[in-house]
């Protein structure tokens, strides 16, 4: 018996267990299969039954674009959506976070949180213009300002002169403060996510070259956030900037993949692969500085490559609307 001879329900059941990266290759194989892949109901089934894959994406060469738009991109399907920004990006430094809420039909409705502040090195943090905006995919609406599900951000409390983790709940559209681990000395931090289930903090003290990776309990529960030390090692190279631009953690092998920039005149982008207790350490020259950056941008500022932990999903952007984001 061949696949065309099988009952449609059985065909759908088989395809729902195919990895997302393989589904992409099958879209052009059969008109019937392609119709199944575009069905929102199938996307939900595929999310729950297909094996979870993990990939590392790296942003290599930053481009200076004379535009005011944000792009949402699904690398798995190659679909994109361009979104017009409300506030002039030239006057502000912006950060974007993608999150979702669960609707009544147990489907995910996605939103984008934008935080922005005025870029003025001469002004104190208290004097800078600061704001938040929300964009909702379900209505393809314009940006709306926030006056006062979740995404997590490292933040600095000006009043208490301390660092905190801010959780933004996309359902209530409110911020909540979460505590960080207790560190014996001041260092630099980077926040990441492990398998979409746990938060991780990279803490690095440059004076001692000591690096620690802390991981929380599962963040998809209502339990109190607890931190535990997962990995500690030494960073052999001191010739790098104080902040790692991004990181990826292999929890089982206790290895961290970091992307950074040398602190010398070359400003080379380097990938560091570091294991626990100095068991493994290597540096890989990833990208030489691009001259166009120094022509168009401030020559005194360093520009980083970034690493992203990406799990392929059957995200469908149809006629500019995000139908389902798993």
Curated annotation (Swiss-Prot):
Record Gene3D superfamilies: 1.20.1280.50
Positions of the F-box domain: 1-50
Name of a matching Pfam family: F-box
SUPFAM superfamilies registered for this protein in UniProt: F-box domain
Coiled-coil region(s): none
Matches recorded under PANTHER family: F-BOX ONLY PROTEIN 9-RELATED, OS09G0372900 PROTEIN-RELATED
Full protein name: Putative F-box protein At3g22710
């Amino acid at each position: 018996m061949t696949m065309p001879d099988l009952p449609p329900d059985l065909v759908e059941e088989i395809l729902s267990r195919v990895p997302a990266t393989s589904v992409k290759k099958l879209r052009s194989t059969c008109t019937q299969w392609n119709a199944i892949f575009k069905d929102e109901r199938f996307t939900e089934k595929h999310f729950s039954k297909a094996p979870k894959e993990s990939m590392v994406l790296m942003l290599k060469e930053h481009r200076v674009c004379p535009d005011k738009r944000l792009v949402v991109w699904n690398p798995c399907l190659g679909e994109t959506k361009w979104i017009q920004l409300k506030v002039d990006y030239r006057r502000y430094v912006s950060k974007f976070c993608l999150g979702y809420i669960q609707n009544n039909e147990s489907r995910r409705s996605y939103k984008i949180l934008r935080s922005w502040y005025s870029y003025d090195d001469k002004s104190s943090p208290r004097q800078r213009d600061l704001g938040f905006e929300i964009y909702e995919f379900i209505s393809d609406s314009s940006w709306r300002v926030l006056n006062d599900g979740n995404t997590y951000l490292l933040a600095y409390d000006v009043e208490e002169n301390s660092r905190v983790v801010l959780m933004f709940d996309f359902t209530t559209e409110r911020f909540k403060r979460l505590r960080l681990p207790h560190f014996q000395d001041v260092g630099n931090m980077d926040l990441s996510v492990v398998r979409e289930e746990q938060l991780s903090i990279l803490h690095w003290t440059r004076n001692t070259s000591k690096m620690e990776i802390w991981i929380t309990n599962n963040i998809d529960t209502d339990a109190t956030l607890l931190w535990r030390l997962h990995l500690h090692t030494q960073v052999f190279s001191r010739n790098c900037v104080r902040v790692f631009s991004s990181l990826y953690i292999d929890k089982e092998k206790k290895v961290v993949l970091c992307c950074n920039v040398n602190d010398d005149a070359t400003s080379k982008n380097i990938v560091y692969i570091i294991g626990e207790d100095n068991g493994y350490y290597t540096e890989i020259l990833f990208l030489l500085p691009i001259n166009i950056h120094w022509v168009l941008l401030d020559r005194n500022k360093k520009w980083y490559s970034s690493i992203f932990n990406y799990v392929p999903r059957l995200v469908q952007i149809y006629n500019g609307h995000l139908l389902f984001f798993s």
